[in-house]
Amino acid sequence: MARYRRHSRSRSRSRYRRRRRRRSRHRNRRRTYRRSRRHSRRRRGRRRGYSRRRYSRRGRRR
């Protein structure tokens, strides 16, 4: 029984770690996306087609 308990404990620990890491990553991504979107409006006037195409592709992928 001790062996099983030990295994489950380590498993849950790794799970928690992954969840925490993923959450922080997502938060950062959201922030950068908002910032880039704000600044992208100014650059859109110079390179309309290229910048727009690249941005839309990136948003869909992420």
UniProtKB/Swiss-Prot annotation:
> What InterPro entries does this protein map onto?
Protamine_P1 (IPR000221)
Compartments where found:
Nucleus; Chromosome
Which coarse location class applies to the principal site listed for this UniProt protein? nucleus
Among the entry's GO cellular component annotations, what is one?
A: nucleus
Keywords (A to Z) from UniProt? Chromosome, Developmental protein, Differentiation, DNA condensation, DNA-binding, Nucleosome core, Nucleus, Spermatogenesis
- Nucleus keyword on record: yes
Tissue-by-tissue expression: Testis.
Gene name tied to this protein: PRM1
- Annotated protein name in UniProt: Sperm protamine P1
Residue numbers spanned by region Disordered: 1-62
User: Which positions make up the signal peptide?
Assistant: none
> Listed GO molecular functions?
DNA binding
Q: Which GO terms describe its biological process?
A: chromosome condensation; sperm DNA condensation
